[in-house]
């Protein structure tokens, strides 16, 4: 290699370059981290530097496998379990319908409620007269 020309000149006006400080050698924490990474690399435990797309694809594959296992478990359900699920769904539907009816009745205008009360009292009077 060729010698730099600033070594030959003894010009005091020039600023001579100084050797840069190596951060690995100066910091104890950095040295420990570097040593640990080298040991892990030798053992084959290096952190996986996979691209983001590859990580997403692996996650999707795992999710698909889990989903397939759940579906297979559902397919293996007995007739009793299937019937119980159907009944539970019917009960939930009935409860929802009752709630909707109650909400409709509560939200109905006052004159509709009064009309219903008058109709009921009229029917009760008619039944009382017949008996």
UniProtKB/Swiss-Prot annotation:
Induction: Is not up-regulated in the hippocampus by acute social defeat stress or glucocorticoids stimulation. Expressed in the hippocampus and hypothalamus. Expressed in the pontine nuclei and reticulotegmental nucleus. Expressed in Purkinje cell and nuclear layers of the cerebelum. Expressed in the choroid plexus. Expressed in hippocampal granule neurons of the dente gyrus. Keywords: Acetylation, Coiled coil. Residues 52-79 have a biased composition (Basic and acidic residues). The keyword Acetylation applies. Residues 61-112 form a coiled coil. GO terms for biological process: sensory perception of sound. Residues 39-79 are annotated as: Disordered. It comes from the Eukaryota. The modification N6-acetyllysine is found at residue 50. The modification N-acetylalanine is found at residue 2. Belongs to the FAM107 family. PANTHER family: DOWN REGULATED IN RENAL CARCINOMA 1/TU3A, PROTEIN FAM107B. This is Protein FAM107B. It comes from Mus musculus (Mouse). The gene is Fam107b.
